[in-house]
Amino acid sequence: MAMKKLLIASLLFGSAAAYGADGFVVQDIHFEGLQRVAVGAALLNMPVRVGDTVSDEDIGRTIHALFATGNFEDVRVLRDGNTLIVQVKERPTIASITFSGNKSVKDDMLKQNLEASHVRVGEALDRTMLSNIERGLEDFYYSVGKYNASVKAVVTPLPRNRVDLKLVFAEGVSAKIQQINIVGNKSFSSDELLNRFQLRDDVPWWNLTADQKYQKQKLTGDLEALRSFYLDRGYARFNIDSTQVSLTPDKKGIYVTINMTEGDQYKISGIDLNGNMAGYQSEITKLAAIEPGSLYNGTQVTKMENDIKNLLGRYGYAYPRVMTQPEINDQDKTVKLHVNIDAGNRFYVRKIRFSGNDTTKDSVLRREMRQMERAWLGSDLVELGKERLNRLGYFETVDVETQRIPGSPDQVDVVYKVKERNTGSLNFGVGFGTESGVSFQIGAQQDNWLGTGNAVGINASKNDYSTYAELSFTDPYFTINGVSLGGRVFYNDFRADDAELSGYTNQSYGISGFLGFPINENNSLNFGLNYIHNSLSDMLPQVAMWRYLRSMGEKPDLESKAEFKADDFALTMGWTYNNLDRGFFPTSGVKSTLNGKVTIPGSDNEFYKVTLDTSAYYPINDDRTWVILGRSRLGYGDGLGGKELPFYENFYAGGSSTVRGFRSNNIGPKAIYLYKDGSPKKESPSRDAVGGNAMAVASLELITPTPFLDSKYSNSVRTSFFIDSGTVWDTDWNDSAVMKSKGIPDYSKPGNIRVSAGIALQWMSPLGPLVFSYAKPIKDYEGDRSEQFQFNIGKTW
């Protein structure tokens, strides 16, 4: 660089004598050294043209202009008579860019960083820019505590003035915090304050969020947490005076010293509201009701400001300014809050637009909107629209933004940006157990048929004990007011004996329909009617089965298999509460569904059934990557008019949807087969499950970030650790002396609770939804069958 400057300077001085004070007229311009850059492109960048009279100043500007293009490492301008000779040395072209040794920084991030600095394949190499990139990357490593890190750019020359660029990283190890000292704290111990830090010099095994590795960003967050801790407890004059970060000589250890001044505690003396409140002073006054005499609380003040902004936002004032200036009285230790409010203009919505919905029709999204066009902008309605789109389950992500209209002082467009996920599936299920072997299921489901929002499903299963087919349809907006219409038809040929359930065969078919009515944003009711035909055969003499047949007026023969047919009409009713944040992989909210079914006159059976299903998600960190999920299912059914609940309507538990680790439907009462004289067989109880008329299932899950997986995939992959529990019982069971003498359990008691624990992985893969679980029974009973590993695989479409 020094030689280049010297050459240019000498050239300019030397040319003064050659060109003369009046310069000369350029008759031709000749380039030497051009390879990649075209002559025409170089001429366009020069301020001098053929026919111009040039001077020393013009030559200097020419050299500067050519350097400014970034294409040349060296430029020299010479004169040969009336011809300008421009000698250049082009910068080499980057042929490839590779990285080596980078673990903390992904290749994609590095490429984006280089792109921003105009370092890319096919561009000229600027060595000065490389030096800046090296320093910038090293500064990044220093900020995350890797003080031994180094970054070197290795440039390898290639033919035709090309180079390979390789960034070589030596990341080293992260410096660990040896000690954090807090100086100046009087009211609270250092341990109490450090418990609120992410950075720690000693991390307990149970603390999943703390970290001993130094990061500048985390220290900044910890200092802010320390400041908030004191401000929330009345210390209005609290101040962090200084922070020192010291390295050990080997650069592997960090000592942090925080010097602070606590000050005294201050109380609120009053609140003064000022400014343009757009006529909502009474509502704002209620939001600013901080009790005089209470300790000053910074978080409470911030919440008050946000509440005022949200209130004004609901009434169309999209960009209000709310600033609180505390007036501190050091003499009586009080703070008066002066809240300055400027509501600004009221904004109206010009258009609501959608992007990213390549399959889903605009009308499907638009019907979920509660914000109307040409109405004033309501921030709560805009956010509600986002929640409702998320709840559909059609999209991986939903984002919304308001865009101001250029030239308009009071108009905005509301733009929802969605990323669609595959809502259709051609799937098959696979289960494996040490005793059950392998089973299969196949089906097709499209929750967003042709982008209309309608759900269409065709499901079928074929295995050793069942042939099942079902066709279902749901239109969630049968009417413009959101009344839904749905129905299904099905056929089932079920051989329970082959499924290791109580021995019988049931050929059934039916049809059902329902109407759903929205009550408000989170509640809905549905009413339906169904018809089911059941044709039972091959019924072996068994206590629960014979008890049901006798209640129906039948007199089954203990010496032969029984047959029975029933046609039933039933009224169904349901209530659903749903405030989940999204329909797929929720992270917060509750969904509860209460369903009931009762037979109506004209039916052979007389019974009712009620079920309550609840799922509740509670995020435990701000990013919602750690979530607690609680699930439960309660069910009860019984006969009416002296009849019993049909045994084929019993509840069952066990399997991937209830208690994982146990074989499907295996938990609960077992079949008690009878001899010809009506006494229980000596091998009773059998291992065949018969279910019961009552059920309780509960599950607790900890949803965690998936190890070794980038956070950007959190919307498509979910990992959880779980504990499942459940039981099924028969409230009509007669625990007689005969049963006791045979050692048969009392199936009328709900206390035989099964428990399992395990891990689950759900993945919405490009090939379809995959669900894996591995669970081990913790508490089981004689006759239970385990199925520790279960998974389902599907293909989306």
UniProtKB/Swiss-Prot annotation:
Reported function: Part of the outer membrane protein assembly complex, which is involved in assembly and insertion of beta-barrel proteins into the outer membrane. Constitutes, with BamD, the core component of the assembly machinery.
Main localization, broad class: membrane
Presence of the UniProt keyword Signal in the record: yes
Protein name in the entry: Outer membrane protein assembly factor BamA
Keywords, sorted A to Z: Cell outer membrane, Membrane, Repeat, Signal, Transmembrane, Transmembrane beta strand
Signal peptide: 1-20
Keyword Ligase carried by entry: no
Subunit structure: Part of the Bam complex, which is composed of the outer membrane protein BamA, and four lipoproteins BamB, BamC, BamD and BamE.
GO cellular component: Bam protein complex
Gene3D superfamilies listed in its UniProt record: membrane protein fhac, membrane protein fhac: a member of the omp85/tpsb transporter family
Compartments (UniProt record): Cell outer membrane
HAMAP family: OM_assembly_BamA
GO biological process: Gram-negative-bacterium-type cell outer membrane assembly; protein insertion into membrane
Classification via Pfam families: Omp85, POTRA
Domain POTRA: 24-91, 92-172, 175-263, 266-344, 347-421
Family: Belongs to the BamA family.
